[in-house]
Amino acid sequence: MTKVGLSLKRILKFGVYYGVADKLPYSVTAGFGPTAKRVRRWAAKDLFEHAGQRINVEKGAWFGSGRGVSIGDRSGLGLDCLVMGPLTLGRDVMVGPRCMFISQAHNTGDVSLPMTDQGMAEDRPIVVEDDVWFGAAVIVLPGVRVGHGSVIGAGSIITKDVPPFACVAGSPARVVKYRGSEGTPSVS
């Protein structure tokens, strides 16, 4: 059976994560926060397809069964983050609070049928390369690849691929500068 297959261990970890661990205090909360972080990591890591070293899964993060979700070393899911469908986070990825990664969509092409009867489209996985920072409340849509070293401004909606080292912002997001470049507007 694969790691993401059904097993007693997975069922128990699922129950512990969604029944207890995801409700524990934010990891930087004085006192119990660091312990809560370790409990969430312990409960969540076996649910993911891959979990690297020192991952962080914050309070309220929702990732379904974890099927198709891979998190690289020193990366994590922020406070109240939502993952719907396959997602790969590289190494050293910071995800701010309330970000959404949505790799699922509904079929809408048949105008003779109500959209509720058209079912789901095939998942289009989201890939986030290494060393990326997502500000708060970013939405990433199906099939997007976010390039190495990028910075995504708070509240941005990512509808297409982001080049390496780009700083993007807006709805839909657009490149406002590249990291390391001088004399260009900064993301605020």
Language-model features: where?
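Conserved catalytic segment of ABC-fold P-loop ATPases
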Residues: 147-150, 163-165
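Acidic, glycine-centered active-site loop in nucleotide-sugar glycosyltransferases
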Residues: 164, 169-172
